[in-house]
Amino acid sequence: MTELRPFYEESQSIYDVSDEFFSLFLDPTMAYTCAYFEREDMTLEEAQNAKFDLALDKLHLEPGMTLLDIGCGWGGGLQRAIENYDVNVIGITLSRNQFEYSKAKLAKIPTERSVQVRLQGWDEFTDKVDRIVSIGAFEAFKMERYAAFFERSYDILPDDGRMLLHTILTYTQKQMHEMGVKVTMSDVRFMKFIGEEIFPGGQLPAQEDIFKFAQAADFSVEKVQLLQQHYARTLNIWAANLEANKDRAIALQSEEIYNKYMHYLTGCEHFFRKGISNVGQFTLTK
């Protein structure tokens, strides 16, 4: 098999703007993925922790298990797993900022369990683990590597292994037509903007892709849970937070970066409300 090299440069260009800039619109968990508003009155922080619980509960974690978080971000999911599920954790990320931030954050949590954060891609990871969670990282993996990703994940899990994959989803033109979703030239321009300015190298899967590649690696898809309007609400809050911190954001970065992120957050909210984009959690079992 050809050796795969992680896309470090792409990931670092996306996430290594500055931790403080992201903290202006994210909640204290620093989760940069769709929240789960289990109750209408939830704060963003409560909804992000509810999202982590929603994902982790599907893994049937038991004390002492080892959980791998692929694309662990700023460590919010790892922290939740350590504090609420009493497991050993390994988080991997391609972002140096996220790696340093997560290491420092998790070092402050009292636990008898093993806690590791690595600057490493899934394609370099070969340790055996009991469970895998990946929230908002799959979008950067590229379709030509989907097969290898699911095969690697399957190989490092035990016979009763479980994996939770949380990813943004797209639809084919045919599906959008059937759903009555009309894609305008403005929508097409926004897609181009996202691909060039915000997530260079990103590629969104369709639900069918997850089924096809996961099942080809011998996973069973136990459950799919879509969270489309939860992401629209998350993005709405992020945009409001960033707008409220406009002066600080410009001081930290620039007016150009501030405007770029406002355009991105408001445009993505529109995509989720309109039905162009979706987001789902896929529970995979061996």
From Swiss-Prot:
Pfam families tied to this protein: CMAS (PF02353)
Protein's cellular compartments: Cytoplasm
Enzyme Commission identifier(s): 2.1.1.-
GO molecular function: cyclopropane-fatty-acyl-phospholipid synthase activity
Disulfide links within the chain: none
Gene3D superfamilies hit by this protein: Vaccinia Virus protein VP39
Residues engaged in binding S-adenosyl-L-methionine: 32-33, 67-75, 93-98, 122-123
Annotated active site: 268
Name of the top EC class for this enzyme: transferase
GO cellular component: cytoplasm; plasma membrane
Signal peptide bounds: none
Keywords from the named record: Cytoplasm, Lipid metabolism, Methyltransferase, S-adenosyl-L-methionine, Transferase
Keyword presence, Mitochondrion: no
GO biological process terms, semicolon-separated: lipid biosynthetic process; methylation
Function as written in the Swiss-Prot or TrEMBL entry: Methyltransferase that modifies short-chain fatty acids. In vitro, catalyzes the transfer of the methyl group from S-adenosyl-L-methionine (SAM) to the double bond of phospholipid-linked oleic acid to produce tuberculostearic acid (10-methylstearic-acid or TSA).
Similarity comment: Belongs to the CFA/CMAS family.
Protein name, entry field: S-adenosylmethionine-dependent methyltransferase UmaA
High-level lineage: Bacteria, Bacillati, Actinomycetota, Actinomycetes, Mycobacteriales
